[in-house]
Structure formats: C-alpha cells, structure tokens
C-alpha cells in the first residue's frame, strides 16, 4: 500500500517539474 502511494506522489512531482522546465525554455 505504501509503495502505491509513493508512486502516485512521484508521478505528480514529475508532472510539476515538467511544467517548470517548459517555462524555463
């Protein structure tokens, strides 16, 4: 159960990082 939650959180963090990178461009 904990692993599933961690994966979900990581996915959300990755998405936020992608948006930030696009803004830097």
UniProtKB/Swiss-Prot annotation:
GO cellular component: cytosol; cytosolic large ribosomal subunit; nucleus
Region (Disordered): 1-25
Subcellular location: Cytoplasm; Nucleus
Keywords from the UniProt entry: Cytoplasm, Nucleus, Ribonucleoprotein, Ribosomal protein
Subunit structure: Component of the large ribosomal subunit (LSU). Mature yeast ribosomes consist of a small (40S) and a large (60S) subunit. The 40S small subunit contains 1 molecule of ribosomal RNA (18S rRNA) and at least 33 different proteins. The large 60S subunit contains 3 rRNA molecules (25S, 5.8S and 5S rRNA) and at least 46 different proteins.
Purpose: Component of the ribosome, a large ribonucleoprotein complex responsible for the synthesis of proteins in the cell. The small ribosomal subunit (SSU) binds messenger RNAs (mRNAs) and translates the encoded message by selecting cognate aminoacyl-transfer RNA (tRNA) molecules. The large subunit (LSU) contains the ribosomal catalytic site termed the peptidyl transferase center (PTC), which catalyzes the formation of peptide bonds, thereby polymerizing the amino acids delivered by tRNAs into a polypeptide chain.
Protein name (database record): Small ribosomal subunit protein eS32A
Gene name of this polypeptide: rpl4101
């Amino acid at each position: 159960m904990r692993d599933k939650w961690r994966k979900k959180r990581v996915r959300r963090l990755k998405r936020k990082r992608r948006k930030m990178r696009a803004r830097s461009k």
